[in-house]
């Protein structure tokens, strides 16, 4: 069952002096430059910035997908880049729920198999009560045997959300989750993410170029030229 939490605040994520440089010498490109901030458990943070600002690079490093050139990423007090590749892959699968713009579903697996894949890769049994709760909230009960190509874009993104949630991750990271959807489906997906954030205290960090989405977050971090230009709480 998805845990409903409340009460005192606690730090779930800390980024310390994070930098990322691609290439070397005259061709070196600094994608991130000395970025530091922390996120509390249950916080909804929107990261915004123009194309090429470094926001997607930052998200990939928060999710353990791309190693920084320097600096630290601590998730629930674990410095994830002190882990070796095998340990990092396991940590990412168990503690980070990733949601992508283009869904990244396995085309030969049906809805149920895509959602439960992180558990099966870990050799864990599916908690039927939790699974049923997730698919009910996502309105996927009648789509469990469908393959991704039999679903609409909005339905595929719901599957992606279910997969991200199935392990009760410490953090959900969403990279432009509405970028491939029409306005109706975009609104529904954002409402679902907000519901999981508020009802179940699920920490949510979302990359978006859509100001309307960003303004629904608790906090907005603006990145430009690889640096934080603004970090403000818009609601508490």
Show which residues each predicted segment covers.
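ABC-family P-loop ATPase nucleotide-binding domain
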Residues: 1-21, 229-236
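ABC family nucleotide-binding domain
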Residues: 11-223
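H-loop (His-switch) and adjacent beta-strand-loop-beta switch element
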Residues: 220-232
